[in-house]
């Protein structure tokens, strides 16, 4: 019974050790660049909402 706290502490330490397969994301990584590109595309689409509704009737149905 006295080894239980030691076992729990060891499990917590093992879980907190970073593994070799984990890689930090930088601004040059493709997933992050894709994320920012998608955000810009969505913001551009939302800002063009008025123009879309003026020129295309079907577009207003989505808004």
Swiss-Prot record:
GO terms for molecular function: toxin activity. Residues 22-50 form a propeptide. Contains 2 disulfide bonds that can be either 'C1-C3, C2-C4' or 'C1-C4, C2-C3', since these disulfide connectivities have been observed for conotoxins with cysteine framework V (for examples, see AC P0DQQ7 and AC P81755). Pfam families: Chi-conotoxin. Keywords: Cleavage on pair of basic residues, Disulfide bond, Secreted, Signal, Toxin. Expressed by the venom duct. Residues 1-21 form the signal peptide. It is found in: Secreted. The cysteine framework is V (CC-CC). One of its GO terms (cellular component) is extracellular region. Belongs to the conotoxin T superfamily. InterPro entries: T-conotoxin (IPR031565). This is Conotoxin Gm5.1.
């Amino acid at each position: 019974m006295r080894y239980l706290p030691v076992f729990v502490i060891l499990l917590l330490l093992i879980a907190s050790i970073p593994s070799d397969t984990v890689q930090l994301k930088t601004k040059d990584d493709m997933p992050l660049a894709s994320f920012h590109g998608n955000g810009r595309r969505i913001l551009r689409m939302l800002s063009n909402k008025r123009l879309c509704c003026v020129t295309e009737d079907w577009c207003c149905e989505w808004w």
